[in-house]
Amino acid sequence: MKISPSPRKLSKVSTSVSFLISFALYAIGFGYFLLREDAPEPLAQAGTTKVTMSLASINTNSNTKTNAESAKPKEEPKEKPKKEEPKKEEPKKETKPKPKPKPKPKPKPKPKPKPEPKPKPEPKVEEPKKEEPKEEPKKEEAKEEAKEKSVPKQVTTKDIVKEKDKQEESNKTSEGATSEAQAYNPGVSNEFLMKIQTAISSKNRYPKMAQIRGIEGEVLVSFTINADGSVTDIKVVKSNTTDILNHAALEAIKSAAHLFPKPDETVHLKIPIAYSLKED
């Protein structure tokens, strides 16, 4: 059996055949055109002009020209480059160098004044110091008396006896000191010295502060008895005890001054006054 080809195959065959035929026709026309341009044209006879032109050549030339013109981009007119004017160089300002500050002259150090030699103090001649009687402040005694007055003590017979004994002892010491008084006062009668001693012992009081503290000692007092009976220049000449007893000795002489006998002439005396707590 014969099989007939399908319409698809037939259409493919016909298209390929038509393509080959059209390609062959185009190739023949193109070859003819090339041969036609290369063949020399016969010279025209005299008096006659013969111009032969083929439409294909005109069309092709015109097309090629138009295509060439269209293909060429229009050249825009180029702007001429402006000549740059040379910039004028501004004259540089000359910077003047700043003047250097002149160094200030250093002040010359002032010469220090030489210290003047101080005059050496002349050695002072020491005068012999007079032994003045040191008076004890009366405040302590006043306080003690005020305390005694404010607090009344019960006085017993024993206390009275003790005080009498102490007073007698102080009187004995003062009487016993008459021999010493005679040694300090040559040329004065014993009777006169005894009267002075008894007057002093009657007014002499042993300070309680000294008794409490157990202070003892001897005070040598000097004084002057004038012809009118006045007593002056009372002072402590020598002492081996405290100011409490020194003050008590001076007060004893001041209080007993009105009991002293009047001398015929001015007399300078030195009387030792002893204070002792020892019981015989």
UniProtKB/Swiss-Prot annotation:
Gene designation per UniProt: tonB
Gene Ontology CC: outer membrane-bounded periplasmic space; plasma membrane protein complex
Keywords: Cell inner membrane, Cell membrane, Membrane, Protein transport, Repeat, Signal-anchor, Transmembrane, Transmembrane helix, Transport
Compositionally skewed regions (Basic and acidic residues) per UniProt: 71-97, 113-151, 159-172
Regions of compositional bias (Basic residues) in chain numbering: 98-112
Native species: Helicobacter pylori (strain J99 / ATCC 700824) (Campylobacter pylori J99)
Periplasmic compartment segments: 36-280
Ranges for domain TonB C-terminal: 191-280
Sequence ranges of Polar residues compositional bias: 56-69, 173-182
A single GO BP: protein transport
Stated role: Interacts with outer membrane receptor proteins that carry out high-affinity binding and energy dependent uptake into the periplasmic space of specific substrates. It could act to transduce energy from the cytoplasmic membrane to specific energy-requiring processes in the outer membrane, resulting in the release into the periplasm of ligands bound by these outer membrane proteins.
Taxonomic superkingdom: Bacteria
One matching Pfam family: TonB_C
Location(s), subcellular: Cell inner membrane
A GO term, aspect molecular function: energy transducer activity
Name of the protein described by the UniProt record: Protein TonB
Region annotation (Disordered) ranges: 56-184
